[in-house]
Amino acid sequence: MLSTLKYPDYKTLNLQRYARILSSSVCVPERVVTNDDIIKQHDLIATDRAVQYSIGIQERRYADEDANVSDLLSEAARLCLERSHVQPDQLNRVIYTKLMGDQMIPATSIKVLQKLGVRRSIPAFDIMAACSGFVHLLDMAIRYIDTGDDYVLILGGDISSRLASTKNKKDTRTIFLQGDAVVGMLLGVSETQHFLASYLYTDNTYFDYSFIPFGTEMLNKTKAFSNQMFNMQMPDGMVIHQSVVDSCELVANKLLAQTRLTLDDIDVFITSDQTTFTWKAQLEKMNVPAEKSASQFFKFGNTVAALSPINLQEMIDTGRLKRGMTVLFMAHGAGASGGGLIFKY
């Protein structure tokens, strides 16, 4: 591991009011974009076979140019509410983990409330934690329910293809990676404990290894404004890959120690799959059979905070995850953050 930081010990979850997952959803644009589509559009020196060999992706979804992420998010939210037979005005809180959102302010989660027709002035806000954002939201949601909320809606993902590269310059290290998708999850109150452990961390060692430059650091007189400010920058992809694999081992072991479980007690093992090979490397590191997990990177690409929830939904939709099963759910973001939870589905 590159980092020399000390990772904190786990703290046992001390909850008096329990949460459970009522429903979940995935919403993707209709437009399918293949590797060949990208190669032809940008006249790149690459082949579909080479792209699949290097990162394991076949296709991804792109949103229409006039689409906003709040359009996708509101649909994902509606699906969650319908599946749980919960009305929008019953929500106590909405939190969205974004990459960009519709705009910088106000929060995109507020726009979702507007599109859902919510008539109550409930809290709604956005956070940013890259690919690990959804585990942060899950941790927050179970604590909000512990302190009095009845229904917490959490949302993740974005129209991240627009940050793969600009029209002026195409970066072949990132242009094939990104895909557009969002996810939703509705949590409610339970009489029994479902969430058994939670562990989150950040590691500033990796701050400069995956980033989007735009910010006050770039908006000064010594820097020329450029579209490159909005590009996803990844100076060393192998460092990010290894940080994810290392994070997987660290977080999984912290969670298992917290619950006194072993991997044999885990029915479903979910983690973020920034590439197909990163997912496989994590399973190999933990000696987890592929049948216990899922990766949809080959189909949707890097959907940032939606990565792990999409894999979870795949296990649900295919019947491999059933109520009562034990899930180890993790996500690792941009090298600089990560975490996970163990819960009974």
What spans do the regions from the language model cover?
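Condensing-enzyme catalytic core mediating Claisen C-C bond formation in acyl metabolism
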Residues: 2-65, 168-242, 250, 345
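Glycine/charged-rich beta-loop-alpha catalytic/anionic-binding loops adjacent to active sites
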Residues: 57-58, 90-95, 114-128, 164-170, ...
